[in-house]
Amino acid sequence: ATHLPTDSLIEFVHHFPFVLPELQAVGVRCTEVLVKRLPPRPDLGHLKKQAKTLLAQARAGDAAALARLAPLALPAGTDLRLHHTQWCLAREHGFASWPQFQAFVLARRALADDPQRSLATWLRWVYAGDIAGGADNARPEVAARLLDEGLVSLPADDPWIACAVGDIAVLQRASAQDVGWLHRAGGPLALPPLVAVAHSSLLRLPGWRERLHACARWLV
């Protein structure tokens, strides 16, 4: 591997060209996206070790390691820490932060360990614990990513699930068959339709917000 003098590390990281997703935290944009894929049963412990290894390599001046850190656009003179390399791994897999990435890894592992409960597991990321049960916070970015990657299969004509994702066409079909469902709690979490829409954490995501708002307007 090629090595650089210690005093050149941060300058190298700061100026090395890169191709990765939009870096919202530092205001950097690019036109091409390269996102790494996880195995079917990702191991969070292994990923943590990868972050530690990357940190050691970068501190040693390894050019390949520093090139991976370049998208972080760290200020010159930054003392590289573990949270920097964890953030790097998260970015490489298409996540804005390590906590988001960690949550996705745990969710994907849970789906792999118990595929029969995939819908119930997914709903725990859509709704906070006060709705879905437990003490966990909702993770809309995780729920959306699981859908995008085809890791969760939703019932096609369940109107309460449609409320969670803002599928107004399903709501309209359900009402044409039985208008009474609008006033009943139902679905896996036994929620009234409007509650299922209003408490869906997918409302926080721009790509989902308008469709959920449309469902809420239609329900009222």
Predicted segments with their positions:
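Extreme N-terminal basic, low-complexity initiation segments
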Residues: 1-9
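Short alpha-helical "patches" and their helix-cap loops
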Residues: 4, 101-110, 176, 214
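Intrinsically disordered, low-complexity eukaryotic regions enriched in glycine, serine
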Residues: 16-18, 23-144
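Ankyrin-repeat boundary/"N-cap" motif
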Residues: 114-133, 154-164, 182-206
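Ankyrin repeat domain, specifically the short helix-to-loop turn at the C-terminus of the second helix
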Residues: 144-152, 173-181, 214-220
